[in-house]
Amino acid sequence: MKYFPIWTEKLVPFQFPSLKEDLRTEVVVIGAGITGVTTAYLLAKKGVQVVLLEKDTIGRGTTGHTTAKLTIQHGLLYHELIQHFGVENTYRYAKSQTEGLTEIQQIIKEESFDCFLQQDDAILYTNDTENAKKLEMELDAYHQIGIDAKIIESLPFDIPYISGITLSQQAQFHPLIYLQGIVKVLQQMKVPIYENTLAVDVVNEPQL
């Protein structure tokens, strides 16, 4: 039995050609998932000449199989980052994540994408005593870098639970509707897009 992400239901995939000839551009963006198409969009909006390449078809990779959450919370991460890179660098990382979250929501608003964007809390929880201690360390790491998180006493659904931390002002959305919306804007901006085009190497050559 094959399983398909719910995001792909009722969405008609794009059909872009593969790249078969040489071309010249200022920037090549490799990969047409959320990161790639958003990067191409932001560059094109700044007037940069961009080409977007995808080795498969758009939406078939990580983006098509995502959990669809927009959050700066990525598992038990910040305590580890502080241990390895210090408070200041971890703060910078968290700041970049917050800016990315804001940027995506701003794009959705500016382009009027109906991609079911919804503000929500992000919850990290466990039903294991040892992991509950790790959650306490993660919460302490949050507070060291100015992230406003808190312990929650219960979950909004009935599953085994010992401890959890929550972040407010996070979000969720339909990732492929967002992706398709950005791609349509890129088409309007005349950005060349190629599917089934594998980038195999990057060669540094002297500039003429």
Feature roles, as predicted:
Residues 1-27, 45:
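Extreme N-terminal leader/targeting segments of oxidoreductases
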Residues 22-52:
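N-terminal Rossmann-like FAD-binding beta1-loop-alpha1 element of flavoenzymes
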Residues 67-72, 168-169:
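Short, hinge-like loop/turn segments at secondary-structure boundaries
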Residues 73-152:
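Dinucleotide-binding Rossmann-like beta1-alpha1 core, especially the glycine-rich loop
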Residues 133, 140-145, 165-208:
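Helical element adjacent to the flavin cofactor pocket in flavoenzyme catalytic cores
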